[in-house]
Amino acid sequence: MKTLLLALAVVVLVCLGSANQLGLGRQQIDRRQRQAIGPPYGLCFQCDRKTSPDCSTAKKCPWYHTTCYTLYKPDDACGEEWAVKGCAKTCPTAGPYERVKCCYKPECNND
């Protein structure tokens, strides 16, 4: 029983170590240069007005998705309102009667 627990502990430690090497753990910071080490990621608000109208928490984006965007669509009052907020590698293209606003700083699509 003790050997089984010891083997399980070793497997957990090895898996956690490999997760950190893959960048799945905490973001590492180079203290001297004050920069993040490893693949860049964005921190954007990600939601759809139809499924979650309250978009109050920013989420970590996938690797290299550093562009935050807000997609606006026409509303009933002849104006426009946001329809989708998210992150992408590059700024998405707006469709007909749509407008996309892109930004490149963490949590910048909170409007």
Curated annotation (Swiss-Prot):
It comes from the Eukaryota. GO terms for cellular component: extracellular region. Expressed by the venom gland. Disulfide bonds join 44-68, 47-55, 61-87, 91-102, 103-108. PROSITE patterns: SNAKE_TOXIN. It is found in: Secreted. Residues 20-34 form a propeptide. One of its GO terms (molecular function) is toxin activity. Keywords: Acetylcholine receptor inhibiting toxin, Disulfide bond, Neurotoxin, Postsynaptic neurotoxin, Pyrrolidone carboxylic acid, Secreted, Signal, Toxin. Its main location: secreted. Residues 1-19 form the signal peptide. It holds the Pfam family Toxin_cobra-type. The modification Pyrrolidone carboxylic acid is found at residue 35. Belongs to the three-finger toxin family. Ancestral subfamily. Boigatoxin sub-subfamily. Heterodimer of sulditoxin subunits A and B; probably disulfide-linked. Reptile-specific neurotoxin (tested on geckos). Inhibits nicotinic acetylcholine receptor (nAChR). Not toxic to mammals (tested on mice). This is Sulditoxin subunit A. It comes from Spilotes sulphureus.
